[in-house]
Amino acid sequence: MEESAGGSNQTILARRGTMSEQRTNSLSYHITAVKKGERVFENAFQGVSRMILEGEIDKVMVNGKNTFDFRIFRKGPKHIVGMYDEINSFVSFIKDASEGGSSAEMAFVLVGEPGNGKTFLVEYLCKLYRRFLSVPVNRRYTFRFVGLDKLGSYGNITTIESQTYEDPLILAMNLEESRDESGAHLARRYRIDRKMLEKWFENYRPLGACSAYIWNNIREYTGGKFDDMLEFIEIVPVPLVESLGTVTGKYPAKDKITSSAVDLLGEESIQRLLHITDTNNPYRFDLRRGALARVAGGGIHFSDEIYKNKKDLVQVYLGIIQNRCIEIDGYKWPIDTLIVATSNNSEFNRFLAEKEEAPIVDRCRICYVSHNTNHVLQKELTAYAIGNEAKTTLTGDVMHQDPNLNYAASVGVVLTRLPRSEKLTPIETMKLAAGEVAGEKSLKTLSEVIDTLSQEHDITKRFGQKGLGQRNLGRTIQLMLESSETNEGKCMFAYDVFNAFERVILDYVAEAKDRAKFLEDLKIAKGLYRERIMTEMFNAYMDEPLAIRKDVLNYVNMIIGIDAENLGADKMWKYKNPQTGELQALKIDERYINSVEDCLGLKTREQKDSFRTSIRKIYGQKISVRPDYDFMDNLELVKAVTDVRLKSDIAGSGSLIGALANRTNEENQKLYDRMIETMLNKLGYCTTCAQKTIEYFCTQVDEN
């Protein structure tokens, strides 16, 4: 009888063992899946690093220096614009941490002016990470203890999930009482080779206090029988719901009275104490009441305005950043979390002034975030500020957007962000920062200016660190939209943006010195807008959207062909168009070439030859990389060509202004009507902005 009873017990245990092997939510199934590569086991740094580096990587030139552009940050309708240096610093930090470098014991802190995209960058990263983890092979798993009513000391609590979302492999590496025994057990039971085991154990950490305590209770209850112990374990995926704060969680700085360490770490739970009979059980602490435990299983913790927190909270962060561990009353819960934080310059400087707080800064990798200084990229950011929805007036009519609005706003806001320099004028700095041509000045000059400014101890004096931010740009657009002129005309007229900028500068910029500089920058921006309107008027006059572009390219092709060997007496030159690949013929007009160069102020033969050489050099450099390059960023050349064409066609720009301003005779009225028609049908204007633009063109204000 005893033998048969013993035999039947063995059969039951064997069956139970095979059941635990077969269950898809069993630990054995999970270990086998990781072994086969169907699931992954990696820490937070390795996960984020893999997510970024598996995407495409481009090489780009930024402010005269080569850098990398990670394509993953450029996807989606509202993606990250610019921020090349900041993203490169972050990727380097993550990569170092994922390889076990010193970054693993640090937090990454973005410091900069308000409204320059720090929070947006971190939230975008969190969104990418959640999407990355939603792919089945990348999904995070944790474990829970079931059937706890059998143990007797947990009251009505039957199921307990790992409070810090520990990975099932962390449990696997702590199955036995010592690390070595657990490793030997895994190798023996699951036939895991030494190399894979070593790789897993690189991410070894002990179980959190409550998981270890419960696991020990289970061991005592089952008498250490491994198959029986596994029956108490269930593997579950970590929820990816953003609003739960799991995997990616944000902790914004609160006021000094209501905030406490409980918000980060958790606290003793009265509800749990009603059930747990053993007062030594660490499960009496509810860790998920705090923000950290919810992201402790390979997540990202985002601390917004970290240095605004009161001192005792900063001290809590100090321990967490260094030790990667939640500690309450001597109990410890190791965590696997990437900590990213933000701070504005003034709060950071105030914090640095308090010397006793130095240790926390010592444990942070500080990255100074500048405003976007590339006016071409700014067009995307300005489009974000304007919004992609169709605008309406206060009375519900459709609101039109001036085709020059984005350019005017982008140039206006970028110029305020560029520091003054003796080596470069503001316009030269702006053009070089966007990778455009700035006369004789090269990107090397811009690099030197940036390097000199980066020596400044005061961060706000560095390149791009001070200026009107994205929020101020948003306010500017709001002021435009609420004005009566905009609503009555049913159009966001581009020139009105400068009046709105002026209002924002006067109302929101605190320092008088900054206000004076920004207002000066606004005058320069108006001059650039004026030059753009000259071009637009010429295109409208010629009844062709790209008339000026054709004439600029004609000038460039003429100075290339003027020295050609196969140039006949008829001055006809045949060349291959790099954009279309077709063979084209062009008559070289030396009078036209000389007129353009005279307009540029080039009087002597040497000056003209030097200018032509520089244009040919730019052509050689740009066309090989960008066959569609059109020299329209060379504002001086565009202005000269516009002036020459207007003079040759209607005896000077002054005459066009005169004709448009004085419409008493029939001929002038016909010209005005024809230009309005072209602007409406071909150039994207509405009646309001077309009339206002011509009116502005006739005033001759803002000429640089």
What would you call each of these model-derived segments?
Residues T11-A14, T18-N704:
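Conserved ASCE/P-loop NTPase catalytic core
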Residues M1-G7:
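Iron-associated oxidoreductase/ferritin-like identity signal
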